[in-house]
Design a protein with these regions (language model features):
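Asp-box/BNR beta-propeller blade signature and adjacent active/binding-site loops
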Residues: 14-358
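Sec-dependent N-terminal signal peptides
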Residues: 2-12
């Protein structure tokens, strides 16, 4: 797979952006490939998952996982790790917890629309090689998952989820809310408890959350409403000051949002990285913004990918070497892309960015 060198900061050779198309329509997991997620494993490898099949609402969908080997520098072939013989599956989130357990959270749709979904899970104790049977994370109708969990200072795990209502596939209603589930791995029982709701004027979903201090959390969420051209579409921002138990009313942030997923990550330096579509109507460009003051201001911004395409569902992590790894989908939801850059690249002077190599 050919990596495309997109930009090079003149000041430092390390400050570059590389994007490769990991899987395309030719990959035999079905033409459709959407919301990808990624995690760093204890041995230095990476693992990504996505759900694929013949279409978003097809009954043949499954969650597929693939690994990047640090030893070879290559991605292995994807294999199915979650499937339901009677129902469609959706968004998958993979995450290695601090104790080494790899979690897979994914959506199972019980009816014809996503508002009939529940959340199921699996765990792996050998780095994603083998997986447990599936179990219920939330059996509440309309609950879905998209964002990566957060390991809190308390030792608990906080899982961002959302509750979608209604049966209109072209509209996200105002009663759709971002929510959180909380789990304490020190307890014997495996129970994810509800922990806070974010409400907003247009509705919101797919929260991405960071912990700025032991009690202070900030979430950026995809807006509700329609998918057509908009003049009033912004990322929804909310805060918690009690460790994620309660949340402020969601308010419009300074960033546009075309009813598309965003991701938020606190870097090792303490800076906060936001990846989003810098448009109210289109899922292009895909942009990175950097805050050095706890999301109060965002002085640095660079496009990761731009052009006539749809660059959607960013999911971003930082590995122990400081590198930032981003996965996103493109090409009418038929391609999964992997971008690698660092904080210095985001701080660099803006320059034109190009779509992934085809």
């Amino acid at each position: 797979m050919k990596a495309l060198l997109i930009a090079l900061a003149l000041a430092a050779p390390a400050a570059e952006l590389r994007i490769e198309k990991v899987f395309g329509p030719e990959t035999p997991t079905g033409r459709y490939k959407h919301p990808a997620s990624i995690t760093g494993l204890k041995n230095g490898d990476l693992m990504l998952v996505y759900y694929g099949g013949e279409g978003e609402y097809a009954v043949d969908t499954g969650v597929f996982g693939a690994k990047w080997s640090r030893a070879t520098g290559k991605w292995g072939a994807p294999r199915m790790i979650a499937h339901d013989p009677f129902r469609s599956v959706g968004n998958g989130v993979v995450w290695q917890a601090p104790d080494g357990v790899v979690w897979l959270f994914y959506v199972v749709r019980w009816g014809s629309t996503w508002s009939t979904s529940r959340i199921q899970g699996k765990v792996s104790r050998d780095g994603g090689e083998t997986w447990s049977d599936s179990f219920v994370v939330s059996d509440k109708e309309g609950m879905m998952v998209r964002g990566q969990p957060l390991a809190l200072d308390t030792g608990e795990h906080l899982l961002p989820v959302y509750h979608e209502t209604g049966y209109d596939t072209e509209m996200v209603g105002p009663d759709t809310t971002s929510r959180f589930l909380r789990y304490d791995p020190r307890k014997k029982e495996m129970e994810w408890r509800e922990s806070g709701v974010i409400r907003s004027r247009k509705g919101n979903l797919q929260p991405a959350v960071v912990q700025l201090s032991p009690k202070h959390l900030v979430a950026y969420c995809r807006r509700g409403g329609g998918y057509g051209p908009a003049k009033d579409g912004y990322i929804v921002r909310a805060e918690s000051h009690d460790g994620g138990w309660t949340w402020s009313e969601g308010a419009d942030a300074a960033f546009p949002n075309p009813n598309s997923a965003v991701d938020l990550l606190k870097l090792r330096s303490g800076s906060v990285l936001l990846v989003y579509n810098d448009s109210m109507s289109e899922r292009t460009p895909l942009t990175a913004a950097l805050s050095t003051d706890g999301t109060k201001s965002w002085p640095h911004k660079r496009n990761i990918a731009e052009g006539k395409n749809s660059f959607a569902y960013p999911f971003v992590i930082q590995t122990a070497d400081g590198k930032i790894h981003l996965v996103f989908t493109s090409d009418s939801r038929t391609a999964v892309n992997h971008a690698v850059f660092d904080e210095e690249w985001v701080r660099g002077a803006p320059s034109g960015a190009s779509p992934p190599a085809r």
